[in-house]
C-alpha cells in the first residue's frame, strides 16, 4: 500500500501538476483472503509448468488446467488447486467441475491457440446475502453433455441460487455481447449494503470487495458533507451503488 500511494501521489503531482499539501494514508482492507465476490477461471489444455517442472524431465500426460491466465501467455493458465481470494465454496465448485470433465468423455478443455474444445470458462459470484451464482461458458452447443454437467453441478451444490450458461464461439472470452441462459434458479443474485438491495447479474459491474466498498462509500459520503439539498450525479456508475448510498 505504501508504494501504491507513492505512485498515486507521483502521478498527481509530477504528471498532473497538482499541488497537494496533505495526502491521507490509504486505508487497507481488513481482510486479505477470501474477500472477492467474483472470480473467473479459464479451462485450458495447456497448463503452465514451473521452471522446476520443465527441468525435471518428467512427462506430464494431462496438461489440462483450470485457473488464471499467465501474463504474456494467452494460451496458458496456472492450474489452481486452492484459491485464497473467494469463499471456499468457489474452490469446491471449480474442482468438482474440473473433476467431472476429466472423468467423463466428451469434455475437452479449451485450446485457446487453435480454438478447439468444449468447456471454456467459469464465473462464480457470491453475495453477503448468501446468494450464489455460477455461469459456465461452453465453446459450442452439445445439449446432452451440457445438461449432464449442469445437472451434476445443481445436484452437488443445491446452495446455488443462479445457475446459468453461455455458448461462446468467438475467439475471445468476453461474454458482454453473448446471450446468457438460465439453467436453474434466477438470472441474478441479490447483494445488500446498509439496507439497500442490488440485483447483480452476470454482466453487472459491482465492486469485487463488498466489505471494502462499503468502507469506501461511507468515507466518501462523510467527506461530501451532504445536507440532503444537493443534486448528486453518479457519472460513471455501474450497479448504481454510490448514487443510492449517498441518497440516504
Region spans (language model):
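Accessory RNA-recognition modules of RNA-modification enzymes
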Residues: 1-248
Amino acid at each position: 500500500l505504501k508504494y501504491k500511494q507513492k505512485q498515486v501521489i507521483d502521478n498527481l503531482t509530477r504528471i498532473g501538476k497538482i499541488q497537494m499539501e496533505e495526502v491521507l494514508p490509504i486505508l487497507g482492507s481488513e481482510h486479505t483472503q477470501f474477500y472477492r465476490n467474483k472470480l473467473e477461471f479459464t479451462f485450458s489444455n495447456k497448463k503452465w509448468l514451473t521452471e522446476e517442472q520443465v527441468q525435471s524431465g518428467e512427462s506430464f500426460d494431462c496438461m489440462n488446467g483450470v485457473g488464471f491466465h499467465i501474463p504474456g501467455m494467452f494460451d496458458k493458465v496456472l492450474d489452481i488447486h486452492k484459491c485464497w481470494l473467494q469463499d471456499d465454496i468457489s474452490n469446491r465448485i471449480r474442482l468438482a467441475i474440473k473433476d467431472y470433465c476429466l472423468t467423463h468423455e466428451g469434455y475437452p478443455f479449451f485450446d485457446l491457440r487453435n480454438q478447439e474444445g468444449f468447456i471454456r470458462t467459469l464465473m462464480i459470484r457470491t453475495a453477503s446475502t448468501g446468494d450464489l451464482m455460477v455461469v459456465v461458458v461452453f465453446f459450442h452447443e452439445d445439449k446432452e453433455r451440457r445438461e449432464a454437467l449442469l445437472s451434476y453441478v445443481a445436484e452437488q451444490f443445491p446452495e446455488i441460487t443462479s445457475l446459468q450458461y453461455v455458448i461462446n464461439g468467438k475467439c475471445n472470452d468476453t461474454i458482454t455481447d453473448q446471450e446468457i441462459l438460465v439453467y436453474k434458479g434466477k438470472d441474478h443474485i441479490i447483494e445488500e449494503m446498509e439496507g439497500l438491495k442490488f440485483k447483480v447479474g452476470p454482466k453487472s459491474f459491482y465492486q469485487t470487495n463488498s466489505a471494502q466498498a462499503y468502507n469506501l462509500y461511507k468515507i466518501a459520503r462523510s467527506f461530501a458533507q451532504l445536507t440532503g439539498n444537493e443534486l448528486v450525479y453518479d457519472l460513471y456508475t455501474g450497479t448504481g451503488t454510490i448514487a443510492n448510498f449517498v441518497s440516504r
